[in-house]
């Protein structure tokens, strides 16, 4: 989990230190890697062995910033997340589709990346 109200324990900088100690560790960082600390997710986590999910992010972040994170980190390291039961799957999917990614990018984020990560694709 990343970027909670108590940022001290879920800040991107802290996760980066863990990744420095365990470079082969693969991590999924919720909320595009930072929730309320998206600039730090770009600064400390982009390009690392981290997958970001989209849960509880797209309603709170503007399209330009979310696209910057997705494109800079790489669509192959982004996972769709709804944060159900907090938000409905349908609403989160609609928010995601409004980003305007290509069909190929959508397929990766909506399932193929997770399948590859979990070893089923």
Each model region followed by its residue ranges:
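C-terminal active-site rim and adjoining tail of enzyme catalytic domains
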Residues: 81-84
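Mid-to-C-terminal alpha-helical segments outside catalytic/metal-binding sites
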Residues: 72-79, 89-121
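Catalytic pocket-lining loop regions of alpha/beta-barrel enzymes
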Residues: 1-79
């Amino acid at each position: 989990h990343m970027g909670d109200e108590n940022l001290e324990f879920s800040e991107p900088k802290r996760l980066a230190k863990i990744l420095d100690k365990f470079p082969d560790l693969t991590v999924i960082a919720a909320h595009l890697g930072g929730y309320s600390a998206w600039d730090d997710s770009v600064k400390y986590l982009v390009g690392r062995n981290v997958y970001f999910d989209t849960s509880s992010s797209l309603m709170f972040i503007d399209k330009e910033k979310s696209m910057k994170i997705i494109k800079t980190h790489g669509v192959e390291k982004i996972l769709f997340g709804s944060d159900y039961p907090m938000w409905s799957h349908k609403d989160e999917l609609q928010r995601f589709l409004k980003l305007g990614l290509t069909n190929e990018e959508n397929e990766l984020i909506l399932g193929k990346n997770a399948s590859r990560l979990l070893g089923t694709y």
